[in-house]
From Swiss-Prot:
InterPro entries: Bifun_inhib/LTP/seed_sf, Bifunc_inhib/LTP/seed_store, nsLTP2. One of its GO terms (biological process) is lipid transport. It comes from Apium graveolens var. rapaceum (Celeriac). This is Non-specific lipid-transfer protein 2. The lineage of its organism: Eukaryota, Viridiplantae, Streptophyta, Embryophyta, Tracheophyta. Plant non-specific lipid-transfer proteins transfer phospholipids as well as galactolipids across membranes. May play a role in wax or cutin deposition in the cell walls of expanding epidermal cells and certain secretory tissues. Stable at pH 3. Stable up to 90 degrees Celsius.
Length: 67
């Protein structure tokens, strides 16, 4: 998978509005999993990826954020 945070756009509502993640969101999150640690190092993305909403979304999708 190419690392592109835009790919995670289906997760935006789940992350920002605290709604359950869609199947599309979980699929993209799993695809982008190898990229998540890189996003955490990016000052523009860090606040989104490390937010409680993002962590909850990842957890709901069964994706562990371990960097």
């Amino acid at each position: 998978a190419t690392c592109s945070a835009v790919q995670l756009s289906p997760c935006l509502a789940a992350i920002t509005k605290n709604t359950p993640p869609s199947a599309a969101c979980c699929n993209k999150l799993k695809e982008q999993k190898p990229c998540l640690c890189g996003y955490l190092k990016d000052p523009n993305l860090k606040n989104y990826v490390n937010s409680p909403g993002a962590r909850k979304t990842a957890s709901s999708c069964g994706v562990a954020l371990k960097c």
